[in-house]
UniProtKB/Swiss-Prot annotation:
Family statement: Belongs to the UvrC family.
Alphabetically ordered keywords of this record: Cytoplasm, DNA damage, DNA excision, DNA repair, Excision nuclease, SOS response
GO biological process, one term: SOS response
Entry keyword annotation includes DNA damage: yes
Protein name, entry field: UvrABC system protein C
InterPro entries per UniProt: GIY-YIG_endonuc, GIY-YIG_endonuc_sf, GIY-YIG_UvrC_Cho, RuvA_2-like, UVR_dom, UVR_dom_sf, UvrABC_protein_C, UvrC
GO CC entries: cytoplasm; excinuclease repair complex
Protein's job: The UvrABC repair system catalyzes the recognition and processing of DNA lesions. UvrC both incises the 5' and 3' sides of the lesion. The N-terminal half is responsible for the 3' incision and the C-terminal half is responsible for the 5' incision.
Ranges for domain UVR: 202-237
Length: 605
């Protein structure tokens, strides 16, 4: 194989292009680009300079395919296109991290304070942050609650409760839900909390101190003590008075690396405001330069729909600015400026996203190392040949044999792989038989379209009866995968779980051991996904049956309503005009639908 590879290199052109490394059964192992194809492919023969991962890859290469391009820009775009469509196993892997956490204050009449991650909804919330960690958000919210007595309950709870909750009893909320505070006074507290989050602590402290002195002069010592306590809690909040605004639409990027992992941080500004930030993790990148990593990332991030802003700021060590500009223009037909920081404001923003990316990378690596420790213990306990890279966990859910759903969740060395979760709708005739349900799920999993992906370990939510079912399915399909069944103990308390493995006595683990807690986490995640999937299926059927009762709503209109609103509750909250906007729904029919669903309010879903 290596001799054949060397022969191909000899005939390779010294021009710009893209190369595709192909292994056994025409499997695409790697796709790369180069200014000089012959020179780049020759580099792979310098084994002493290659990482272990790339050495293993080269040993599997049977042939190399070459695509000559006009220039580097065309090569960059073609490489990105081929990687997206073919997903080679040895290429850089891009994973979204959790977005950085923010504090939100809602635009409700009685605003709620909460932690938030995700896309911004500026018509619903005011955003403050981002914060470096969820713990920082939690501590800040707690101090703001104590200082300003703001509510954290949901809007639904707020509108329906008749008495103050525990937050009021422990002096963390002023109970606006039951009029323990006037709307004006509550909104003043909200404004002071907002000023604090914007770094105006001194002004807020001055206001509180002035009010405390006034109460004291009027001998209202009880109220003076309240403001004294507010001042104390306010001093615990250390907000950075950094200006998170930018005059132009712009994205700021950082690249932080350690070993084979990189974190690219993105801080976005649109309409002169902070539009959110998120870390992306790049795996298998030790053989790539920072310029290669960032340019590849950018042509994957932006597209004609998700268009880049007019300005993109990158660290000073990024040199291929012109190539990135030209590639983004070719991709979006939009002129983009890729810039280095020119003033203190721009440098501050680049430093901010760099520091947050550094924190995210450190947290990611810490989590990874902790996971590896647990997986090594799991390997020993269940006598696995290697530390598992892919664990699949199975669970079923139904109510009296109805809306039966089986699920598979997947965990790897870095945590849950939610994009690989699967749901299995169970056949009706099984009627709640858990053993038959598990047989069907496993049979479909290992004979379906992902049958070639073999996990390193299976964890089944079940007892000794499930062991023979799993064994039988795997034997019939000629698949060898180690597995264990995990059942709750006699009292069904967490920590008393029993494990059942073929050819071994049942056993348990110490309730506080890391492995037991990890296995409980896996089982609970599968259970959560099963319950959620079952509930969605049940709600969908209930939704369909509710609409079937309405004269004039046939299968086509029912499908349109289901697609548009998703639930009966959402229809009941909609306006007449919104229902009319659904294709095929007239004003008269919209009135009938709205009247019908509102008459059914309170029906359990």
């Amino acid at each position: 194989m290596l001799r054949q590879y060397k022969e191909q290199i000899k005939s390779s052109p010294q021009s710009c292009g893209v190369y595709k490394m192909i292994g056994d059964k025409s499997k695409v192992l790697y796709i790369g680009k180069a200014k000089n194809l012959k020179s780049r492919l020759s580099d792979y023969l310098q084994f002493e300079n290659l990482s272990e991962r790339i050495r293993v890859m080269i040993s599997q290469v049977i042939k190399v395919e070459i695509f000559i391009t006009e220039n580097e820009i065309e090569a960059l775009l073609l490489e990105a296109q081929l990687i997206k469509s073919l997903k080679p196993s040895y290429n850089i892997l891009l994973r979204d991290g959790k977005s950085y956490p923010y504090i939100t204050i809602s635009k409700h009449d009685y605003p709620r304070i909460a932690k938030y991650r995700g896309k911004f909804k500026k018509n619903e919330f005011h955003y403050y942050g981002p914060f470096p960690s969820a713990a920082a958000v939690k501590n800040t919210i707690l101090s703001l609650q104590k200082a300003f007595l703001l509510r954290v309950c949901s809007d639904q709870y707020f509108s329906s409760t008749k008495r103050p909750c525990l937050e009021y009893q422990v002096k963390r909320c002023s109970a606006p839900c039951v009029d323990k505070i006037t709307k004006d006074d509550y909104c003043k507290s909200v404004k002071q909390a907002q000023d604090t989050l914007l770094g105006r602590n001194k002004e807020v402290q001055r206001q509180l101190f002035s009010t405390m002195e006034k109460c004291s002069r009027e001998m209202n010592y009880e109220l003076a003590a309240v403001y004294r306590d507010r001042l104390k809690f306010l001093q615990q909040i250390q907000m950075q008075p950094m200006d998170f605004s930018f005059e132009e639409d712009a994205d700021f990027f950082s690249v932080v690396r350690e070993a084979d992992l990189a974190c690219i941080g993105v801080l976005s500004f649109r309409d002169k405001g902070n539009y959110g930030s998120i870390p992306y993790f790049i795996e298998n990148c030790s053989d790539h330069s920072n310029d290669e990593i960032l340019s590849t990332f950018l042509v994957n991030l932006y597209n004609p729909v998700n268009t880049p802003p007019a300005q993109i700021y990158v660290p000073d060590f990024i040199k291929d600015k012109e190539i990135i500009e030209q590639a983004l223009y070719a991709l979006t037909q939009k002129s983009i400026k890729v810039l280095h920081a020119k003033n203190s404001k721009e440098r501050d923003l680049l430093n901010f996203i760099y520091n947050n990316s550094q924190h995210s990378l450190e947290q990611k690596l810490t989590d990874y190392r902790n996971n590896l420790e647990k997986l090594e213990e799991l390997r020993k306990i269940f006598s696995l040949p290697n530390i598992p890279k892919r664990i699949e966990v199975y669970d079923n859910s139904h109510i009296s044999g109805n809306q039966q759903v089986g699920v598979m969740i997947v965990a790897g060395q870095e945590g849950f792989l939610k994009s690989e979760y699967k749901k299995f709708t169970i056949k009706e005739e099984i009627s709640g038989d858990d053993y038959k349900m598990m047989r069907e799920v496993l049979t479909r999993r290992f004979s379906g379209n992902i049958k070639d992906i073999i996990p390193d370990f299976l964890l089944i939510d079940g007892g000794p009866g499930h062991v023979s079912i799993v064994q039988n399915v795997l034997e019939i399909l000629n698949i060898k995968v180690p597995f264990a069944c995990m059942a709750k103990g006699h009292d069904r308390n967490a920590g008393n779980e029993r494990f059942y493995v073929p050819d071994r006595e049942e056993f348990t683990l110490a309730s506080d051991s890391k492995v037991m807690l990890y296995l409980q986490l896996l089982r609970n995640e599968a259970h959560r996904f099963a319950i959620t999937s079952h509930r969605k299926k049940r709600d969908k059927q209930f939704f369909a049956s509710q609409l079937s009762e309405i004269s004039g709503v046939g299968s086509k209109r029912k499908k349109a309503l289901m697609s548009h609103f998703g639930s009966v509750e959402n229809i009941s909250k909609a306006s007449l005009a919104e229902i009319q906007n659904v294709p095929g729904i007239s004003k008269g029919l919209a009135e009938i639908i709205l009247q019908h669903v509102n008459s059914k309010k309170g029906t359990p879903k």
